[in-house]
């Protein structure tokens, strides 16, 4: 059987939507503002980047210190090999509400009407499967409203041709 990772273990991708300087170490969170997607970089805004802005959240830190926001739908792409992943999205602000917003992953709606009150923060994990060479994460809000996201982390869980336990519940038994 042939694995579909580019490396022995696919690295964790950490993105913080901020204007901080580039990280000194590769495992640190990569700051991203409104950079468009390029295949050389392997990440960036695929659609809607012209309307993406950064706003402070009233707290310090790489994850929750600032966030990307937009009033028009936008799509963020990360190049990855096909496989199963945990996508953790971070939301919140000390000074303003978050959402309500809708999240699509590879065109599939994964979260609708999500929102937080000012002063609330949340890390939201999603199980995602990529059958291609990228994951596209879409952000949108109702007309006249804005979407927001602070950071994201993409962690590899397994390749598509690994053990079936990643896709089938182990507790299912035939009678």
Regions found by a protein language model. Give the residues of each.
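Compositionally biased, intrinsically disordered or flexible polar/acidic segments
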Residues: 1-175
């Amino acid at each position: 059987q042939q694995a579909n990772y580019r490396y022995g273990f696919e690295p964790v991708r950490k993105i913080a939507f901020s204007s901080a300087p580039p990280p000194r170490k590769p495992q640190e969170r990569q700051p991203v503002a409104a950079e468009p997607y390029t295949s050389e970089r392997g990440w960036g805004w695929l659609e809607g980047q012209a309307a993406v802005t950064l706003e402070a959240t009233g707290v310090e830190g790489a994850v929750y210190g600032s966030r990307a926001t937009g009033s028009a739908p936008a799509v963020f792409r990360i190049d990855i090999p096909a496989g199963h992943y945990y996508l953790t999205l971070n939301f919140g602000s000390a000074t303003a509400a978050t959402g309500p917003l809708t999240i699509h992953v590879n065109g599939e709606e994964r979260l609708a009407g999500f929102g937080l009150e000012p002063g609330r923060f949340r890390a939201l994990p999603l199980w995602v499967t990529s059958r291609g060479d990228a994951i596209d994460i879409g952000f949108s809000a109702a007309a006249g409203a804005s979407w927001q996201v602070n950071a994201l982390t993409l962690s590899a869980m397994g390749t598509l041709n690994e053990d079936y336990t990643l896709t089938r519940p182990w507790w299912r038994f035939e009678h």
